[in-house]
Structures are given as C-alpha cells and as structure tokens.
Regions:
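Mid-to-C-terminal alpha-helical segments outside catalytic/metal-binding sites
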Residues: 1-62, 118, 238-244, 252-292
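Conserved, mostly hydrophobic/aromatic
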Residues: 10, 55, 87, 100, ...
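Flexible loop residues that form catalytic
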Residues: 12-14, 68, 133, 196-197, ...
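Short aromatic-enriched loop/helix-cap "lid" or pocket-rim segments at secondary-structure transitions
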Residues: 17-22, 75-78, 113-114, 170-172, ...
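Alpha-helical scaffolding within the catalytic cores
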Residues: 46-54, 82-88, 114, 176-179, ...
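N-terminal cationic-hydrophobic initiation segments that often serve targeting/anchoring roles
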Residues: 55, 91-95, 120, 183, ...
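Active-site gating/metal-coordination segments in enzymes
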Residues: 61-62, 67-160, 164-166, 170-173
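Catalytic pocket-lining loop regions of alpha/beta-barrel enzymes
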Residues: 122-127, 136-244, 287-291
Length: 292
C-alpha cells in the first residue's frame, strides 16, 4: 500500500505571508480549547518547492488548495479571505501537483458566482469549498442555493465542512443531515461532506447511503481517532467508493501511516487515498505501468 501515490483533497494556502496574515486576523477572536491544543495555526512552507519536497517524502502526488473564506461570528468580518490569485500561484506553477477549489461568500453571491465561473472555466479549478459556520446560516439556507445551482451547471463538486467546527462559531449549522434537504432540491449535485461529520458521523453515513452523489471526507482527524463506524463504512462495499482522504493541514506522512494501520483492504486503501478523488474530480493522472 505504501507505493500508492496519495491525493489530499483538503488543504489551504500555506505560504508564510498567508499564515502570518491569518494569525494576525485571529487576534481578538474567540479561541476554543481544541484550537489552543493544536497550536492555533495552520502549517506553512517557506516555498512551494519545500512543500513539494514534503509531499514527495510522504508519497503524496497531488494536494487540493482551497480558496477558503471564513467569516468571524464574533467580530463580523471576513477574517480568512483567501484570494483567487493566492491559489493560482500553486496551480499555475505546478499544475500536475496542485488542484484548486474556489471559495464562496454567501454575503456576496453575485461576485462569488462570477469568480467561481472564472476559476473553473478559465483556470481549471475542479470544484468549490465552503466553510459556512461564521456566516451564521445553515448549509441548506437559501443563500447557499445559487452556489449549488452553479456547481450543477459547471458539473463540479462542492466540498463543505460538516460536523463540529474548531473555531468559536456555532457548530449546529453544519449538521450533515442538512445535506439530505439540499440533495432533495439538487439531486445531481456532487457533494463532499468534509471533516468526517463528527460528532454526527452516522448522519453523514446515512446521507451518503441514501444519495449516490455524496462523498465523505476523511480529513481533519488523525486516522487513529476515527470513529469505528466510519472505519467500518470505509471498508464496506458502498463506502470504499465514497470516501476521500485528506489532511486539512495535518502531517501527511503520519496520517497515511495511521490510515494503513486501520486494517483497510489494499484495494480500499487505494480508492480512499487516490482513485475516488481521481474519479470524482475528473483528475488527469499518469496511467499505472502495465495498464492496458
């Protein structure tokens, strides 16, 4: 299994400048217990080449860079406002190694949709990433529906954090069961429920079981802490095709080592860390040696 070149579907801009700006923006924000325990900062690399070297060492072929937009629930401003150009510096310089996901601001719907259109059609982004909590609206709010319609039009997935949120924001808005309502209205929309959905893991599994266009993101948790129900689902006939590995900034090498230690079948491991992402996001990857 160690020879499988992994694809991380969930990461952030990791330049020193971006991380410094993010750390400065968080001053005066509510910092919760878990965020303090993790050090309160995303990882950074001194250069794109340093990041590529770390990816190579861990056996990671591609990393998705999200244009994350996070509204402060406490102070009411966009305290993470990733710019399209910040993602493009990755995807234009190393298009074989980095994949872009556009962002969405439900307070600026028209502008967001225009930028998503440009990101996908002109720059080859493979989808959209949403962090809803600080905006204080649920995933099935009417202000989210223009995004879902646009993703259906462009035939790209929308990845969204579901479950609890680490930052000082209400977690209730990210209940995975809300995806059920969304899919009732957009049955062809391809959705990734990122961050495992904890503590509502079984809600996310149930929605994935019901709808053929829902995937579960195995990210933001070190695999040894995954709920047994999720590991069992990954190893199941249905779940092996509907789970995607990612890190959300956690260390690649240790994450993959822990994932291999869960006892997944080799074919399941390959699907979770690579093949499912290739299929869902329609990625161009090298054909394995010996393939027809």
């Amino acid at each position: 299994m160690e020879d499988v070149r992994a694809i991380d579907f969930m990461y952030y801009v990791a330049t020193p400048e971006f991380i410094a700006r993010w750390n400065k923006a968080k001053e005066g924000e509510l910092v919760c217990r878990m965020e303090r325990a993790l050090g309160g900062s995303l990882p950074s690399f001194p250069s794109l080449e340093a990041m590529l070297a770390a990816m190579d060492e861990a056996g990671v072929e591609k990393v998705f860079i999200t244009q994350c937009k996070m509204w402060s629930h406490r102070n009411h401003w966009m305290y993470m406002d990733t710019q399209l150009e910040e993602v493009l510096q990755y995807t234009t310089r190393y298009p074989d190694r980095f994949v872009g996901l556009a962002g969405y601001n439900p307070y600026r719907i028209t502008e967001s949709l225009q930028e998503i259109e440009r990101a996908v059609r002109q720059h080859g982004f493979r989808g959209v990433y949403v962090h809803i909590y600080g905006f204080d609206i649920p995933l099935h709010d009417r202000r989210m529906y223009p995004l879902y319609a646009k993703c259906v039009e462009l035939n790209v997935p929308v990845s969204m954090q579901v479950g609890h949120v680490l930052e000082g924001m209400p977690s209730e808005h990210g209940r995975p069961i809300y995806l059920d309502r969304i899919l009732c209205d957009f049955p062809t929309l391809k959705v990734v429920g990122a961050h495992t959905g904890w503590p509502w893991v079984e809600e996310l599994i149930s929605v994935c079981y019901k709808w053929e266009t829902v995937w579960i993101g195995i990210d933001a948790w070190m695999p040894k802490y995954l709920k047994p129900e999720l590991v069992q689902f990954m190893n199941s006939r249905l779940g092996q095709d509907r789970c995607l590995w990612g890190t959300n900034g956690l260390p690649w090498k240790q994450s993959l080592e822990q994932l291999r230690a869960l006892g997944l079948k080799p074919e399941v491991y390959r699907k979770v860390v690579r093949d499912n992402a290739v299929e869902l996001f329609q990625l161009q990857v090298p054909t394995p040696a010996g393939s027809a």
